[in-house]
Amino acid sequence: MAEAILAAKRQELALLRRIEERILWLASWTIHNANHLRESRDGLKVGGHQASCASMTTLMTALYMKALRPQDRVAVKPHASPVFHAIQHLFGRQEIDQLQRFRSLGGAQSYPSRTKDKDDVDFSTGSVGLLSLIHI
C-alpha cells in the first residue's frame, strides 16, 4: 500500500515538473518574442525579466496547479507576470496572441493588471518603487 502511494506521488511530481518546464518555456518565449522576434519600428527592446520568471516558476506551478483553492487570491510579483500569463494560457484563460503581443497594445501586460489584462488577475501589481521618485 505504501509503495502504491509513493509511486502515485512520484508520478504527480513528474507531471508537475513537466508542467513547470512548459510554463518556464512559455514565459521565456513570451519575453524573447517581444524583444527579438516581433517586428519593431524603432528596434528598441521592450524588456522582460527572464531571471525573475525563472526564480518564481517552481513556486507558482505548485501554487496554481496543486495548492490554491478557488477562494484563494494571489498578488503576483510584477516581474513574474510572464509566468502568470503562461499559467493562465495553460488554463485556457489567456490566448496565445496575448502572449505574442506581450508589452504591446492589447497584449498581456508586463505587470498584472485587473483592468488591462484579459485573464483573471486578483491584484494589480504595477511597477514598484517608482512612486517614491515622485516625491524627490
Tell me what each language-model feature is.
Residues A8-I23, A27, I31-R41, Q50-I134:
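Cofactor-binding active-site loop characterized by glycine-rich and histidine/acidic residues
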